[in-house]
Amino acid sequence: MKIHRNRPLLLLVTAFILFSAFRADKPFITIFTIGDSTMANKKLDGGNPERGWGMMLPGFFSEDIRVDNHAANGRSSKSFITEGRWEKVISQVKKGDYVFIQFGHNDEKTDSARHTDPGTTFDDNLRRFVNETRAKGGIPVLFNSIVRRNFVQPKDASIAKDARQTPGEQELPKEGSVLFDTHGAYLDSPRNVAKEMGVVFIDMNKITHDLVQGLGPVESKKLYMFVE
């Protein structure tokens, strides 16, 4: 989801940081963001309307809080590590900094460079991010994936329930008015790891699901890359 109208979500994250994170004894706090295209910075050439939500965060903070966005298009938790991107981030983390972690969209891809399994390898990568952040004195925050814009007919609700168990780019029924997601258990791994390790978890999927469902099939297109 490439959102360019992120205000409800960003206000929630801003409130979280301002009320639970601020340290008066530090000159500034850095929020490092790691994830995929839904979070990543975008080129603005040619009037491109696409924005990742991490790109929009700096405008919601004072100069005491800096956002360093390392999210990249097409990356999974696995490829983010193997490409050396995580090493670049963790080498900069200081005591009191935050690391926002959001993967899942691309972990379900079938190619070996990106694929991980929820409950095993995906969870292990999330644990690594958490453990190494804490080892540097940083504070990890886990997010699950932004909802995909998949609307179906009300009569296909049972298909939606089945799709929740089998993530992937399966064939979808005819578009209707009911939103459902196809991330499957990849939505649960960040929640489970957060509970296991005592990490703050933000249910990004629920937040965006409620937003998109509330807007409906037509108005929700304004949040995605439906360019006419």
What does each model-identified segment do?
Residues 6-28:
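Bacterial Sec-dependent signal peptides at the C-terminal "C-region" and cleavage site
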Residues 14, 38, 144:
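Ser/Thr-centric signal marking residues that sit
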Residues 2-5, 26, 84-228:
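Alpha-helical cap/lid subdomain in secreted, periplasmic
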Residues 39-40, 74-76, 148:
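Short histidine/acidic/glycine/proline-rich micro-motifs that form metal-
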Residues 23-71, 87-95, 99:
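Serine-esterase "nucleophile elbow" of acetyl-processing enzymes
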Residues 36, 70-75, 114-115, 173-175:
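Short, basic, glycine/proline-bearing loop/turn elements
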Residues 76-84:
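Structural motif
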